[in-house]
Amino acid sequence: MNTFPHRLFTLLLLLFCFTLGAKARTFILPTDTVKTDSLKTKPTKERQRDLGEATVTATRLVFVTKKDTVIYDMDALGATKGDMLQDMISRMPGLEIKNGALYYRGKAVTRVQVNGTDFERGDTKKALQNLPAYIIKNVKAYEDLTDQAKVTGIDNGDREQVVNVILKKKYLGAWTGNVDLGYGTDHRWRYRGFANTFTEHSRVSAYGGFTNTGQYQSATDEGMWNENGGAGSSSGDTRYMQPGLSFMWNNGKQRGDKGYFMVDGSGGWDYRGHHDESRQLTENFLDDGTRTTRMEHMTTKNDERIWRINLSLTWQATKWTYLEYRPHYSYNSYKDRSHEQEAQWNGGFADNSFSPLDSLLHHPTTGWPLNSAQAQANTLMLDESLSDKGTHYTQHYLYFTQRLSENNWRLSLMSNIGYRYGDEKANDLKQYTQYQTSQASQVDPLYNRYSHTASHDFDFSNYVFLDAPIPGLQSFRFTYGTQINRSHSIADAYRLERLGGSFSNFNDYLPLIGTLPTEAGWQATARDPELTLDQLTLSRQHSFQNNLIFKKKGLTLDLSNTYTLVYDRLEYVKGDYDPLYPSRHSGLYRLGLNTRYETDSIGTFTFSYNYYTSNPPLLQTITLPDMSNPLYLSLGNPDLKKRHVHAASVGYQVNMKHGRMFSMGHTFTFQDNEVTTRSRFDKLTGVTITERVNLPKGSWNYSPNLNFSTPLDKKQLVNFSSSVYYSLTKGRAYTIGTTAEAELYDQTNHQLYVMGGINARLGKWVLGLDNMCMYRTIARSTEVYDNVSSFMNVLDFNVQYTLPWNMVVKSNLQSSRFHNSGGYVIHPWRTIWNASIEQSFLRDKSLAVTLEASDLLNQRDQTLTSVDVNSRYSGWSKCVHRYFMLHVIYRFSTKKG
């Protein structure tokens, strides 16, 4: 028996207990301070006096505020040699990572910059993952003007959330970086490195991360990371690799000066090899007061590779002429194999565990539990699928603006063109067993499908802006735009079981899946008219917009009116059905009012109102059934109406004295003719038929939010932050019909999110305690459905202690609780404990050795629970469990001395 992991566990436990019992001693870090208006500190020279051998220095603050900018001091946050920027976000009041995305005061951060330029344009996560904390001087968070407003000098009140990372000037002109090599138990490894050099007008950053510890992000076809990807532990067993390069160069002139030229870009290769296992349980509530239960068990294995390159060229040709060009290219290769077992029951189970699915798999012929007092099995499905998809994507963006006069008459052009080509080959082998029907069913016992799909998507848009200064206004802007969207896909689909032989037997073809017939003419015999499809979607738009922009004494107002002429056409040729060629001419209208009032004393107020109309996609009006999934038939509706939306929001934010930050917002949305689905479930066959319909009387939503953070002492040794989000939605929904047609009922949805956290620096201690609660409930006007609710609570505790001899001990304990009213939660309690010990060596502490222990209690998974209008859900995904890893971390610099 290998006792090495157990000995490591014991050692870490003893050290953790020691750190909890050690006596805290407060000390002051001697260093420079940052002058701030809000704290009214005196200049450094006045605060630091020469007292012979002794020097008195003020305490380093975690952050200071300058008007609407918050500046976080990285050296005051207690970073270790191995910490990256993302590891320090939780210690910065006002910043948080939520669902993998970075937020500032409750708003999503759209740009992460390094010394004022984007680290990687369009991606806010690369800098968080790859910038080591020790080379960072400070981090600035603020709301900024858009690039277009900066160039034109016309501010319409739009702002974007920006995080600007300022590097330490002592590394100016030198190469700095770090290398982290780690290997551990259970064959876990993590290798990552970063190298960076920068001057006043250039920067080059090279990075690479390679790991199988489950730290990854998922990406879109365009090569961009999904907002919910996130760094951290993913589900399943994942190998993740991400080498890349980011750079910037300008000719030394200041932005806005004649002749200014800058080029910045990035490129890289990303790989994700993923092996996952998950279980899901869904209960649907029917109109007769009963329910159906669906259980799924799935294993997947996939590989994803992304090659990407981005470039941006900026040129201020003259003081009146500006040009920006941004090309992009990416290629995404995705291969997937999955195995799924799924069953449905008419009714529910007392414990709602997964034992009924396991038992049914052991008795697939007779079915179990069948005709029991609790539930009746109606369908068992076994599925094996393969997919091989490649996608090329290229995009070109051009922006040109020309000032025409001294009083800023201006003509601008913005053009964007994008093209995507995709090619996918897919095999899908499904076997169905039905228990409740004795008559012929529309669901066949076996589906052995093969399809080849080629798609071409083309987007082209041009906008011309004319800005005219008018007395009393900053600008009157007229905009004409034209847009073309064209999507064409051709899918050739086949039912291989129609060829007989091994193709018509699930168990015989399972080891051969992906193998195609070799005899001539098999395509004609096996052709599948339900999935063979030639689809062309075309949309042409001409838009006319005018803006009245006013700005004076901190008040900015933008009133806009937009009218768009739209022509939509769909060519829908499906199998043996008659071709459909629907088209539509329509007009869409949008009215917008955006106001912003900024003051230095009482903060910033914002108000916006927007009204707009939108058409349902023509594809939703197609009445031919979508039978890609035999158990779920989808129908369109040619009578769908135009949607109308009213949206208003009010916001306020202020940076107060002594580092306090406060922001709040209220949004109200009303929409009419919202598109939803009306469903009918057949208890005998297990088939659900859905149809798209408009909801009458509309629905509305009210969502307030509040964010507050404050130091609890003058030295900012202890900081508190909190956020509250609430959402109230009131509207109508359809029951799931089974004994009769689905009926409308009123429903009210409440969702509450509360977060509070305390971070403290007490001498050699760095402590953090965060708690997040989320509660959701749905109340219904019908007696058929009970009210449902779900609850989630996550408590996160972090501790860091610096021992003698440059040794640092860290521990993180996260405890989660999940609850679903009347429903089963797979793992209602989960506690994850991570810990590490880091020892620095050499005179400059450039070498460190870290012993990391992950998931000491071996409870990591991804448990999810939720409620919806007509259902509740519980899910579980496997994760990387307990491992111990030894790291060697070396940081280097070519700077002498």
Predicted regions and their residues:
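Periplasmic plug
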Residues: 101-149, 162-169, 202
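Short, acidic, small-residue-rich periplasmic hinge/interaction motif at the N-terminus
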Residues: 26-78, 97-99, 105-109, 143, ...
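Bacterial N-terminal signal peptides
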Residues: 10-19
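Primarily recognizes Gram-negative and organellar outer-membrane beta-barrels
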Residues: 122-125, 145-187, 202-656, 660-897
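Bacterial N-terminal signal peptides that target proteins for export
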Residues: 1-10
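Start-of-domain marker
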Residues: 65-70, 80-82, 87-90, 150-151, ...
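Short, polar/charged loop or turn motifs at beta-strand boundaries
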Residues: 69-87, 114-119, 180-185, 251
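Sec/Tat signal peptide C-region and signal peptidase I cleavage site
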Residues: 20-24
